[in-house]
Amino acid sequence: MATIFFAEPELVIGHGRKVLFLNPGDLQIFKEIELPPDLTTCGLKTVEPVPAPGHPASSSKQQPAALKEATGSVKVEVSIQNVTYSPDRQLLALTTAGQKAVLLYKSRPENAQLLSIRPLARASSAPKVLQRWQLPFWSLTKREIAINTSVLRWMPRHVCFLGHLSIVYDVLWSEDQQYIITCDRDDKIRVTNYPATFDIHSYCLGHKEFVSGLAMLTEQHIISASGDKTLRVWNYTCGKELLLHELPAPAVRMLVRQLEPEKTYEVAVLFYDYVDAIGVYRLEQTTTESWSITSTQLVRAEAGTWNICNFALTDDRIYVTGAENERLTLRVYDSRNGERASGLPEGWLKMVLDNLDVAAFMPEDLSVWFKKRFDNVSDYLERKKRRIEEQKQQKCG
């Protein structure tokens, strides 16, 4: 997986075992993080699981696969899955596949200092770092959300306090830290009270397919993107839908930037399998409970000639990652007209890819995000039709 995002003033790209920090203007690399092939060499340890009494594992000497991966007894390839900053930009969190772990770094201008490394039982799908020194790390896996509640002094075990029956794609924490907002493959957005997470505050219901992304707009409003080809704005405190905007294709990634004046936003959406790869929308709040899309810009990004998987948005450019001939590729487009960006330093792409030491790259198959639907009614009607015809033939015979 290749991850890319823009955090003023840095463009951050993670792939394989490296994270590169670039100046988006001249695309020069000024900092990098490289993980070792074996994370146990930088301190990855595991805690032996304590099975329930009478459980078969309590007497078994066989090591779980996840434990073997972390301890290194089974050789697995380490690759970066996600990279994210804390709000104050002082902490950087990486999650990995292969040897599943979360690494927490102190971000400094010249380099990054590793503070802690912890194993994960499952691969992380959408990590978030919250307020520094307080409940900072979230790790979203298929059916749980885990919090590690200290930065420098980790708790012996993470705390799992929310349950999901399908893959969680995004998470938000309200500004007052009273609500946790999550979305998943099962069409719904859930608003959970915190710290009483057993109590569901509200649901935002209406999507017909997976909800791929969330973003906070105001203290009470969020925006969501979905595979059902819609953008929707919600008052999440009561679960009320305020805006439904039809998209030309399913949305698999969403980025939101606040513009001037206040209550005006730029929303960028990556489409699934569409002639125009990215849509850029201007979203404005007209009244307290009213929102509207006032402009639309579609970016072709040469869709169809390569397999686009992710993108980052700056003031005037869109940085797009994808695969071409099974190799990682980066391209830059002008967000105002959708054309290839001009004025880029010669050889910047080769420089970035050489530093990433890119091997064969295959993006995630996003078709598995969609629900499989079975048409049992048509089969039933066909069988009924044949049965009626057979009965008629028997009567005539």
Curated annotation (Swiss-Prot):
Q: In which pathway does it act?
A: tRNA modification; N(7)-methylguanine-tRNA biosynthesis
Q: What is this protein called?
A: tRNA (guanine-N(7)-)-methyltransferase non-catalytic subunit wuho
What else the UniProt entry mentions is:
Wuho means 'no progeny' in Chinese.
Entry's SMART domains? WD40 (SM00320)
Transmembrane feature ranges? none
| Gene responsible for this protein | wuho
Q: Where are the WD repeats?
A: 75-115, 163-202, 206-244, 303-343
* Family statement: Belongs to the WD repeat TRM82 family.
Q: Where in the cell is it found?
A: Nucleus; Cytoplasm
Give the taxonomic lineage as stored in the record: Eukaryota, Metazoa, Ecdysozoa, Arthropoda, Hexapoda
Function comment: Required for the Mettl1-dependent formation of N(7)-methylguanine at position 46 (m7G46) in tRNA. In the Mettl1-wuho methyltransferase complex, it is required to stabilize and induce conformational changes of the catalytic subunit. Required for binding of nanos mRNA and repression of translation by the mei-P26-bgcn-bam-sxl complex. May cooperate with mei-P26 and nanos to derepress the BMP signaling pathway. May cooperate with mei-P26 to suppress expression of a subset of microRNAs. May cooperate with mei-P26 to regulate bam expression levels in germline cells during gametogenesis.
GO BP of this protein = oogenesis; spermatogenesis; tRNA (guanine-N7)-methylation
Task: Look up the domain of life of the source.
Answer: Eukaryota
Q: List the disulfide bonds.
A: none
Cellular component, GO, one term: female germ cell nucleus
Record keywords: Cytoplasm, Developmental protein, Differentiation, Nucleus, Oogenesis, Repeat, Spermatogenesis, tRNA processing, WD repeat
Does the record bear Nucleus in its keywords? Answer: yes
Instruction: State which tissues express it.
Output: In testis, it is present at high level in hub cells, a niche for germline stem cells of testis. Ubiquitously expressed in all testicular cells throughout spermatogenesis. Ubiquitously expressed in all germline and somatic cells of the ovary.
Relate the assembly described in the record. Forms a heterodimer with the catalytic subunit Mettl1. Interacts with mei-P26 and weakly interacts with bgcn; required for the function or formation of the mei-P26-bgcn-bam-sxl complex. Interacts with nanos; may be involved in mei-P26-dependent derepression of the BMP signaling pathway. Interacts with Myc; the interaction may be mediated by mei-P26 and may be involved in the regulation of ribosome biogenesis.
